């Protein structure tokens, strides 16, 4: 059986990679994918802790996170399509002004 600390290390590594992608990259699509990596690393830890402590709440919470993430991706991709149509860019730096 795989020890719990392997899953914790995997989750931490994926979280650090995702956080670095969110903080360092300038492409909105890459930032969105890095955010998904962050959330999936948290899901790995929820499921691992739920399995090792014989509690199903970690799995249920991971399913809720996946559902909320799907809604977030749908909204973000809609905004991304509108942004590309209006500004013809995917760079975060080019989208700094908001008009009301």
UniProtKB/Swiss-Prot annotation:
Its EC number is 7.1.1.-. GO terms for molecular function: NADH:ubiquinone reductase (non-electrogenic) activity; quinone binding. InterPro entries: NADH_UbQ_OxRdtase_chain4L/K, NUOK/Mnh_C1-like. It is found in: Cell inner membrane. It catalyses: a quinone + NADH + 5 H(+)(in) = a quinol + NAD(+) + 4 H(+)(out). The chain crosses the membrane at residues 4-24, 28-48, 60-80. It is a multi-pass membrane protein. It is an enzyme of class 7 (translocase). The keyword Transmembrane helix applies. NDH-1 shuttles electrons from NADH, via FMN and iron-sulfur (Fe-S) centers, to quinones in the respiratory chain. The immediate electron acceptor for the enzyme in this species is believed to be ubiquinone. Couples the redox reaction to proton translocation (for every two electrons transferred, four hydrogen ions are translocated across the cytoplasmic membrane), and thus conserves the redox energy in a proton gradient. NDH-1 is composed of 14 different subunits. Subunits NuoA, H, J, K, L, M, N constitute the membrane sector of the complex. Belongs to the complex I subunit 4L family. This is NADH-quinone oxidoreductase subunit K 2. It comes from Rhizobium etli (strain CIAT 652). The gene is nuoK2.
